[in-house]
Structure formats: structure tokens, C-alpha cells
């Protein structure tokens, strides 16, 4: 019960920041459309050029690896860039300012080189772990999963470090690991669960909305079923956007607390309790 209570307090604290600057939710929206542009830029030309057929036939494996790696890099870059913009804007709010979308984009733009470098590092780690996982057995996949989880913990604060301290991507990873170890130990606690709460909400929407949609469709209310299905889709999108925004805000608040020992919107004891000491 204490974990559930802490999780809810985290959501409410992040929610207060989001209410103060509702435009922060625009960053995940822009990031989504930018990611779709990256997908279209890579896959549509390859599809029409017949590259996929050659890769599946085994005649262009090297080309497939190169293109796949480049795709990973640019997709990571888009994600990190707009997440950096979100975190940068959230930092302004946490420091008592009143940020705008242009403020966040400006901050991310000032560190575009470091963000791209970090995207290259993250893409490299991701491809290596994925390649090993595909060739490993069940035990090996478990080990790779643990390594991936450890990597996510070690890089938890990289984005705010890049946009606030202006260091390079390698130093950003090192600094992130140092801050987590110094302040909370090396492992995230299970009660850090904004993702869990929204996962449950999304599951509930899918379960209830899906059931209602099926019932109305079976009963012959076709247009009502279509309307319900669209409503479920819109609700899932909204929940996803809010969850992404809250996670970015929480990351900024954790960084602020890790470096200053305080945070305007978060109770320090609550933030501490979301991590377990080693």
C-alpha cells in the first residue's frame, strides 16, 4: 500500500507541474510526428527501390545493417531532442520561471551536438544488446534484459545533464551514473511507477472500451461501436502523451533534487523514497 501511495503522490506532483504549463504536452506530440517523418524517410524510399526484397533474399545484409543503424540513430535523436526540449522547459518551471514551447526548443537546439552524440551511443548499445539477445537462449535473454535495465538506470539523468550542464554525451552518461549512486544508490525502487499507473489506466481503457465496442457491434449498433472505438483510441493517445510529459517532468525534478537537494514541486522525502539505497 505504501508503494501505491508513493506512486500516486508522484503522479500528483508531476501533474501539478503539467497543469502549470500545459503546453509541455506539445513536445511528445511533436516528437511523435517527427518520428513518423523519420520512419517514412527511411522506409518508403527503400520499399520502392526494392531494398527490402534484396535484404530478405540475403543479398544486401550489410546494407540492411547500415540502414538499420542509421534509422536507430535518427529515431533516437528525434526522441532525445524533444525530450530534451521538454526537460529544458520543465527545468525553467521548476526554477520558478514560465517557459514556452520555443524556450524548450531553443534549449534543445543549443545542445543538438551532444544530443546527437548521445543518440549514437544509445543506438549502438541498443543494437548490440538486440543482436546478442536474438542469438542467445532464454538465460542469455534474461541476462541481456538485466543489462538493458541497468543501462536505463545508469542513463536516467543524461538528458537533463546534457541540457543543464552542457557536457558531452560520454561525460553525461558518467555524470548520470554518479548522481544516482551518490544520491539514491544503484537501483530504482519498484514504487517509482508513473509508468505502472498509466499502464493500468491504459489496460482498463482497452478492457472496458473494447468490451463495450464489441457488445455494441454485436447488438447491431455499428456507428456507436465505431464511435466507441475512436473514443478508446483518442483516450489511449491522450494517456500516452500525458504519461510521456509526466515522465519528462519527473526526470527534471529528480535532476534538480539530485544537484540541489530540493525541488519546488516535490517533497524531498517522497523523491528519496522512490529509490532504494544499495
Model segments located where?
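Hydrophobic alpha-helical membrane segments
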Residues: 1-278
Amino acid at each position: 500500500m505504501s508503494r501505491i501511495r508513493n506512486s500516486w503522490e508522484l503522479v500528483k506532483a508531476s501533474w501539478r507541474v503539467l497543469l502549470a504549463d500545459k503546453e509541455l504536452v506539445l513536445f511528445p506530440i511533436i516528437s511523435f510526428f517527427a518520428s513518423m517523418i523519420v520512419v517514412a524517410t527511411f522506409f518508403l524510399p527503400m520499399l520502392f527501390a526494392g531494398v527490402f526484397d534484396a535484404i530478405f533474399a540475403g543479398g544486401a545484409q550489410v546494407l540492411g545493417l547500415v540502414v538499420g543503424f542509421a534509422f536507430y540513430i535518427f529515431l533516437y535523436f528525434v526522441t532525445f531532442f524533444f525530450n530534451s526540449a521538454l526537460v529544458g522547459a520543465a527545468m525553467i518551471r521548476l526554477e520558478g520561471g514560465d517557459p514556452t514551447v520555443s524556450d524548450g526548443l531553443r534549449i534543445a537546439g543549443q545542445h543538438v551536438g551532444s544530443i546527437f552524440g548521445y543518440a549514437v551511443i544509445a543506438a549502438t548499445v541498443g543494437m548490440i544488446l538486440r543482436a546478442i539477445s536474438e542469438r542467445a537462449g532464454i538465460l542469455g535473454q534474461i541476462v541481456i534484459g538485466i543489462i538493458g535495465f541497468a543501462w536505463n538506470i545508469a542513463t536516467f539523468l543524461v538528458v537533463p545533464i546534457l541540457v543543464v550542464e552542457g557536457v558531452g554525451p560520454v561525460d553525461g552518461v558518467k555524470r548520470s551514473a554518479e548522481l544516482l549512486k551518490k544520491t539514491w544508490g544503484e537501483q530504482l525502487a519498484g514504487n517509482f511507477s508513473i509508468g505502472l499507473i498509466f499502464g493500468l489506466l491504459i489496460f482498463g481503457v482497452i478492457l472496458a472500451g473494447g468490451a463495450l465496442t464489441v457488445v455494441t457491434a454485436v447488438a447491431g449498433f455499428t456507428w456507436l461501436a465505431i464511435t466507441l472505438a475512436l473514443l478508446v483510441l483518442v483516450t489511449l493517445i491522450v494517456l500516452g502523451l500525458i504519461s510521456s510529459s509526466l515522465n519528462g517532468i519527473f526526470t527534471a525534478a529528480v535532476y534538480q533534487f539530485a544537484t540541489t537537494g530540493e525541488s519546488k514541486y516535490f517533497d524531498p522525502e517522497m523523491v528519496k523514497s522512490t529509490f532504494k539505497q544499495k
